[in-house]
């Protein structure tokens, strides 16, 4: 049943895949993303880790608290969605790499 099954080869492939996944995760964490709301009146910069790096607010919004709150909420929600999508894309790419393991260490 397990004739030709090379467990050490499979283990090596999984180790390589784990290293690649960690590398991809680190690269994504170091990326910066920017989202804007209100035609650019509010801009949020966020890291791939989901940490807010900077918030820019147009001076004209400082006297309109309600509009400022709405635009901040919109920008924050957009930033969260952007990071979630990036994580999903990263996961899909990693799953694609898993599919490339071929015979999973089995010799033909």
From Swiss-Prot:
Organism in which the protein naturally occurs: Campylobacter hominis (strain ATCC BAA-381 / DSM 21671 / CCUG 45161 / LMG 19568 / NCTC 13146 / CH001A)
Protein name: Nucleoid-associated protein CHAB381_0200
Gene3D superfamilies, A to Z: Nucleoid-associated protein YbaB-like domain
Domain of life: Bacteria
Role description: Binds to DNA and alters its conformation. May be involved in regulation of gene expression, nucleoid organization and DNA protection.
Keyword annotations of the record: Cytoplasm, DNA-binding
GO molecular function: DNA binding
Subcellular location: Cytoplasm, Nucleoid
SUPFAM superfamilies registered for this protein in UniProt: YbaB-like (SSF82607)
Regions crossing the membrane: none
A Pfam short name: YbaB_DNA_bd
One GO CC term, this protein: cytosol
Subunit structure comment from the entry: Homodimer.
Major localization class: cytoplasm
Coiled coil: none
């Amino acid at each position: 049943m397990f004739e030709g099954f090379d467990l050490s080869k499979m283990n090596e492939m999984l180790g390589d895949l784990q290293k690649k996944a960690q590398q991809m995760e680190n690269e994504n964490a170091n990326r910066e993303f920017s989202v804007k709301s209100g035609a650019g009146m509010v801009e949020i910069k966020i890291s791939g880790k989901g940490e807010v790096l900077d918030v820019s607010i147009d001076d004209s919004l400082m006297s309109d608290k309600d509009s400022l709150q709405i635009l901040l909420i919109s920008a924050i929600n957009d930033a969260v969605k952007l990071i979630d999508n990036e994580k999903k894309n990263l996961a899909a790419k990693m799953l694609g790499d898993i599919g490339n393991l071929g015979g999973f260490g089995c010799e033909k």
